[in-house]
Structure formats: structure tokens, C-alpha cells
Regions:
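N-terminal cap/lid segment of alpha/beta-hydrolase-fold proteins
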Residues: 1-28
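Short beta-strand element of the alpha/beta-hydrolase
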Residues: 33-41
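Catalytic nucleophile-loop/oxyanion-hole region of alpha/beta-hydrolase
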Residues: 43-46, 72-107
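Conserved alpha/beta-hydrolase
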Residues: 53-77
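Alpha/beta-hydrolase-fold enzymes
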Residues: 116-202
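Short beta-strand/loop motif that positions the catalytic acidic residue
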Residues: 223, 229-231, 235
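Short alpha-helix in the alpha/beta-hydrolase fold that links the catalytic acid
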Residues: 225, 239-248
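Catalytic active-site module of serine/aspartate enzymes centered on a nucleophile-bearing elbow/loop
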Residues: 256-291
Length: 291
């Protein structure tokens, strides 16, 4: 796995519905060059991304990596979300809190929203709805279009579960093979043995996910901030072609794109991770305040 250069603090914030969220914060030694709020995938959590977060911190960025409600260090309501708007509101509050901190200690530097895998779907919708909160959008192998999308029958079953009000019924996440995430045996073992990884989600979460799928289709005209997308060439989860086509339709006039042809889905675990982290750092270094 490799150790992070900088160790994070583990902190908490409480959203308007009283839910207590854990997050990891990496604080640089000097005045931050920028602030980056990160959103993880459906199964992962902030603890997977210590290396890249530490590298960004060493490069001068304050990194806040939030564990989604019901995921990672958040043990309450595992795998559950009552509504898609609740997940959006969680991110909005985290961004607002981060902007307050930015305004206090480094008011002229940008705030960037980073979403990876499933978190890229959530980040895209937030960027479309609340563009005044971010100066840049980072999408790492985002779950905009995947090879694991629900079939017609899956959607029928989900609708029936909704009608039966089985909102808290747990459904296994169909990504139970670590080989889907990385080709590195040590990292596969880490994923397999990680007790904080999410293995199941509720019907209510899947309904929220379905709504996010709909919202991402209409999001591109509303995403106007500078953006960067990074894909893994050997990704078996993300439909790279469809995702790239979606990305090209963004209203943003400043779009950077990278694809790492030898990498599997989770770039964090791949041998060339210093390459993509360096590319991301260079892009962040060129970002300017827009909001």
C-alpha cells in the first residue's frame, strides 16, 4: 500500500439531520495553496486514499476526505441514505464549512471538489447544482457510466421494493471481487480484508443511486467550472468510452483529460500512481479562484 507522507487528523461534523460524519483532514505545513474536498466510491472510504492525499498535502494542499454517511468510520445506518438530496446536502454542508475555513486562513485560494468512482457521480451533481461553492472539479474514474448498471429487471425489483416500503432492506454491492479494483495482489488482499469497506447498501440507497443516474444525464450543461478527468485504461468497472463522451459534453471551457492505459480501476493502488498524482498536482497548481 505505501505510507502517506503526511498523517491526517480524524475529525467530525454534524449535518442538519443530526448525523455525525467522520472525515480525514491533511493539513500542509504552510499556508495552503488550495483546499480539496474528496468523495469516495460506493464500497471504499477515506482510509483507502492516504497516499495520494498525503502527496497532495506535501504539495501544499489541505485535503478533506469525507466518509459518506453509513460508510467507512461512520457506523450508524450502514449503507443507508434516505434520499438522494440528503447525500447532496451532506456534501454541500461540507463544502460550506470548508469555504468558511478557507476564508479565514487563505481567502484567495481555490476550493476544489474531487469525486472518485461512485463519488464522481455525486460530485458531478453537486457541481451542477451548486457551482458557486467550487472553483474546480476533479473526476477520477467516475461512476458516470459503468459496466454494472442496473438491468430492466433490477429496476422493476427495485420499484417493487419501494412500493412495499422495504427501504432499509440490505442488498449486496455487486463488486465483491477485488480484482475489479486493482491488479496488485497486496492491494487486493487489503480490499478483501478491510473491515471498514461497505459490502451492502439499502433499497433506499439504491433508489437514490437511480436518481443520481438520471441527474448525471442532465448535469453537463450546468457544469461550467474548470474540470479534469482521469481514467484507468484497464478499468473493468467504468465504461470509459461512454464516460468520456459525457465529459466532452460539459459546458466547461477548461477541460483536462488523462487516461493511464496500464492502470486498473482504483488508481490509488496502481504502480504508476505517482504519475497521476503528479499530473493532478500540476493541474491544481494552475487553478485559480472563480467563485
Amino acid at each position: 500500500m505505501g505510507a502517506a507522507l503526511s498523517e491526517p487528523t480524524i475529525e467530525q461534523f454534524v449535518t442538519s439531520d443530526g448525523y455525525r460524519h467522520h472525515f480525514r483532514r491533511w493539513i500542509p505545513s504552510g499556508k495552503p495553496k488550495g483546499f480539496v474536498l474528496c468523495l469516495h466510491g460506493i464500497q471504499s472510504h477515506s482510509g483507502w486514499y492516504g497516499y495520494s492525499s498525503g502527496q497532495l498535502c506535501e504539495a501544499g494542499y489541505e485535503v478533506v476526505f469525507v466518509d459518506r454517511r453509513g460508510s467507512g468510520l461512520n457506523q450508524s445506518e450502514r449503507g443507508h441514505a434516505r434520499h438522494h438530496d440528503r447525500l447532496i446536502n451532506d456534501v454541500v454542508q461540507a463544502l460550506q464549512d470548508l469555504r468558511i475555513r478557507r476564508n479565514e486562513i487563505a481567502p484567495t485560494v481555490p476550493v476544489t471538489l474531487l469525486g472518485l468512482s461512485w463519488g464522481g457521480k455525486l460530485a458531478s451533481v453537486v457541481a451542477a447544482r451548486r457551482q458557486e461553492l467550487i472553483d474546480g472539479l476533479v473526476l477520477l474514474y467516475p461512476g458516470i457510466r459503468s459496466h454494472f448498471e442496473a438491468s430492466i429487471m433490477d429496476n422493476v425489483k427495485l420499484s417493487l421494493a419501494r412500493e412495499a416500503e422495504l427501504f432499509e432492506k440490505l442488498i449486496p454491492i455487486p463488486l465483491d471481487d477485488p480484482v475489479l479494483f486493482t491488479g496488485i495482489p497486496e492491494s487486493q488482499a487489503f480490499i478483501r480484508e478491510d473491515n471498514l469497506s461497505l459490502r451492502d447498501v439499502t433499497v433506499s440507497f439504491l433508489l437514490a443511486n437511480r436518481e443520481f443516474d438520471n441527474l448525471t444525464r442532465s448535469a453537463p450543461p450546468e457544469i461550467r467550472c474548470p474540470a479534469i478527468m482521469m481514467l484507468a485504461g484497464k478499468d473493468r468497472i467504468i465504461d470509459n468510452e461512454a464516460t468520456s463522451q459525457w465529459y466532452r459534453s460539459l459546458a466547461s471551457q477548461e477541460r483536462a483529460f488523462f487516461e493511464y492505459e496500464n492502470a486498473c480501476h482504483t488508481l490509488e493502488f496502481e504502480p504508476d500512481r505517482d504519475q497521476w498524482i503528479g499530473d493532478l498536482t500540476e493541474w491544481l497548481d494552475g487553478l485559480r479562484l472563480t467563485t
